[in-house]
Amino acid sequence: MERVSGLLSWTLSRFLWLSGLSEPGAARQPRIMEEKALEVYDLIRTIRDPEKPNTLEELEVVTESCVEVQEINEDDYLVIIRFTPTVPHCSLATLIGLCLRVKLQRCLPFKHKLEIYISEGTHSTEEDINKQINDKERVAAAMENPNLREIVEQCVLEPD
């Protein structure tokens, strides 16, 4: 019986080691990513919709599950947002994506790469909009437009 117990213990520890689960910090990593995802969500949930008096959270444009954070290396993270416009023909989906990007670029306290997408199948021109909101030059050009910049600033303004 003692041999079986020893063999079982060795097999289990070997399995954990091979799967990477016994490395120091490996059990912590999913929790850290979850905490970072909640941190991101807390920043974006209060963004105001450009045409309604509601937040993106209230309209369910963003939810906790739409935020994913992956570790690139020890100090850098990939933040992926998949938001859902209220209607498939939403004319302001690009502006919402711009607001998400601006808010996170300004407020995230850790180094990150940001990817923002419209949830698959939720907008009639999602592919085009995804390209626009992930193109640094287009984002910079949009923020140079004083009218657009003013709208974005109003949307990302923190509530009192």
Swiss-Prot record:
Gene Ontology molecular-function annotations: metal ion binding
Tree of life domain: Eukaryota
Annotated PANTHER family: CYTOSOLIC IRON-SULFUR ASSEMBLY COMPONENT 2A, CYTOSOLIC IRON-SULFUR ASSEMBLY COMPONENT 2B-RELATED
Name of the coding gene: CIAO2A
InterPro entries documented for this protein: FSCA_dom_sf, MIP18, MIP18-like
Family: Belongs to the MIP18 family.
Gene3D superfamilies on file: 6.10.250.1280, Fe-S cluster assembly (FSCA)
GO BP: any one term: chromosome segregation
Binding site for Zn(2+) 1: H89, H123, E150, E153
Record keywords, A-Z: Chromosome partition, Cytoplasm, Metal-binding, Zinc
GO (cellular component) term, any one: cytosolic [4Fe-4S] assembly targeting complex
Annotated localization: Cytoplasm
Binding-site positions, Zn(2+) 2: H89, H123, E150, E153
Primary location: cytoplasm
Functional summary from the UniProt entry: Component of the cytosolic iron-sulfur protein assembly (CIA) complex, a multiprotein complex that mediates the incorporation of iron-sulfur cluster into extramitochondrial Fe/S proteins. As a CIA complex component and in collaboration with CIAO1 specifically matures ACO1 and stabilizes IREB2, connecting cytosolic iron-sulfur protein maturation with cellular iron regulation. May play a role in chromosome segregation through establishment of sister chromatid cohesion. May induce apoptosis in collaboration with APAF1.
Assembly information from the UniProt record: Monomer and homodimer. Component of the CIA complex. Interacts with CIAO1. Interacts with IREB2. Interacts with APAF1.
Entry protein name: Cytosolic iron-sulfur assembly component 2A
Organism annotation: Bos taurus (Bovine)
